[in-house]
A protein has these predicted regions:
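Short beta-strand scaffold segments in enzyme catalytic cores
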Residues: 44, 92-96, 105, 224-227
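Conserved phosphate-binding/catalytic loop of the ribokinase/pfkB sugar-kinase fold
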Residues: 58, 82-85, 95-133, 138
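A glycine-rich helix N-cap at a beta->alpha junction
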Residues: 75-87
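Conserved beta-alpha-beta core of the PfkB/ribokinase-like small-molecule kinase fold
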Residues: 120-124, 133-203, 222-225
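Conserved phosphate-binding/catalytic region of the ribokinase-like
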Residues: 167-172, 198-306
Length: 306
């Protein structure tokens, strides 16, 4: 079982021909809604890869909350540890997606996600301690994330932190991370090293390992992933595809990567599998609707001789 402690958001998506300037109004396409949130996306990806997934988080007692829970349950995610918090609105994300590049700009209203406490996480310690891996991000409260990583470490379980969105992190938290997986922007800010190429990605990853993270993967979008791990270091290239929407690409990568890792795959193989899953995801619109099945990922890899 892989347990994800994190956010659940309803995504409100508008495709635009370009991103607006400050003070400017532009026309976009019709509003679309899709279930998302970094935590929920990662749990959804784990389930789509065929592994048992458990979600820990908070939603409101509203229609968005019910829809998000239903969407996770539909692919087999265990949502019994998701709290429906009375008086709080479910998290929402406003997402602008560029028509041509598929790049996005996102503003998140955290809502109930921010009400998840360390005490809530500790209340399900047994579930976390029985997991093969625990994944967390930074869209819920920092104390909740810290509690999840601490429980995983104390139980000898694989601990994975996706430090998104960026927040300053103490070395004490990094020292609880078996795998720290930032993107280039988060790595730049956490390591105080501007990531602009593979050499600087390696420098940032090394700096984060020096602060205590056991292994670091810096995701570089179309540039692939730089791996700075105990077992292997180097670059894993992305698979070239025509991107339509990059929302949830990183979450898809993490869910697929961790799944293969707990199944016993070597780091390079697990990263390549994650890259394949993310490559498929960016060719489809939406967050969870874009996440491929394991069969699709394996077929994609076979077609490319990987």
């Amino acid at each position: 079982m892989i347990t994800v402690v994190g956010s659940l958001n309803m995504d409100l998506i508008i495709r635009v021909p370009r991103f607006p300037m400050p003070g400017e109004a532009i026309h976009g396409e019709d509003l679309q809604t899709a279930c998302g949130g970094k935590g929920a996306n990662q749990a959804y990806a784990v389930a789509r890869m065929g592994h048992t997934a458990c979600m820990i988080g908070c939603v409101g007692t509203d229609a968005f909350g019910e829809a998000m829970l239903g969407n996770l349950r539909a692919v087999g995610v265990d949502t019994r540890a998701v709290i429906q918090r009375a008086g709080s609105a479910s998290g929402t994300a406003m997402i602008l997606v560029h028509d041509t590049t598929g790049q996005n700009e996102i503003v998140v209203a955290s809502g109930a996600n921010r009400t998840l406490t360390a005490a809530d996480v500790r209340a399900v310690t047994d579930r976390l301690a029985q997991s093969d891996a625990v994944i967390a991000q930074l869209e819920t409260s920092l104390p909740a994330t810290e509690a999840a990583m601490a429980i995983a470490r104390q139980a000898g379980r694989l601990s994975v932190l996706n430090p998104a969105p960026f927040a300053p992190l103490d070395d004490a938290l990094l020292q609880l991370c078996d795998y720290l997986i930032p993107n280039e922007n988060e790595a730049s800010r956490l390591a105080d090293v501007e990531v602009r190429d593979l050499e600087s990605a390696a420098a940032a990853a090394q700096a984060l390992r020096a602060r205590g993270a056991r292994n670091v993967l810096v995701t570089l979008g179309a540039g692939g992933v730089w791996v700075e791990a105990e077992a292997w270091r180097g670059h894993v290239p992305a698979f070239p595809v025509a991107a339509v929407d990059t929302v949830a690409a990183g979450d898809t990568f993490i869910g697929a990567f961790v799944t293969r890792l707990v199944e016993g795959a070597a780091v390079y193989e697990a990263v390549q599998f994650g890259c394949a899953a993310a490559a498929i995801a960016v060719t489809r619109p939406g967050a969870q609707p874009s996440i491929p099945s394991r069969e699709e990922v394996e077929s994609f890899l076979r077609a490319r001789g990987a």
